[in-house]
Amino acid sequence: WHDYAYGYGIDIFLTLHDLCSGLKVTEIPLGKKVHKPSFNKMIPMFREVATSYYETVQELLTSKAKHNISLDQVDAPVLIQAEPISADAIAERKFEAMNIYANTPSLIDTIPLSSSDRVTKELWVDILMRHEHVVGQTSSYRIAESILPWYLMRVVTYLDDNDNAKAATDEIQQQSDLAVRQWNYEATHH
């Protein structure tokens, strides 16, 4: 157990350990579970989840954990239409992303990020894969900080592009498929 395996980081910590232990992991549809609004907490939530992910991956890579993780295709959960997030709240995330980007040195070589940029699913998966290459070379928190502005801009692009639950579900499925293909490619070519 590491410091980030509590709070928001617990789900990813347990899931990665289960996957590396060869256990079958599946998502259970909860139906119409109503979540408390969390858009305003997304930055601290992301920091904890991402740091927990990178910390756990680093631990698992250096342990004797089983590494034949199967990323078999699973269907994205059907998203439930929620209250739309206001344009002002989305614009605030974009402003925060630009502020964090300007004040956080990046760990990866990439294109500059500007407030007019759209972080598409393709660019997002590329950013994720580039950050995977620095696991073990710097702190997990530092990796999470480096990826945070890209995540916020991905959220902004996602919200701008998807105005209903079906479109949002399709976007998540396409992004997941792309990430699995890229992960499998990286695993066999590096």
Question: What do the PLM-derived regions correspond to, one by one?
Answer:
Residues 50-190:
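Terminal low-complexity segments of carbohydrate-biosynthetic enzymes
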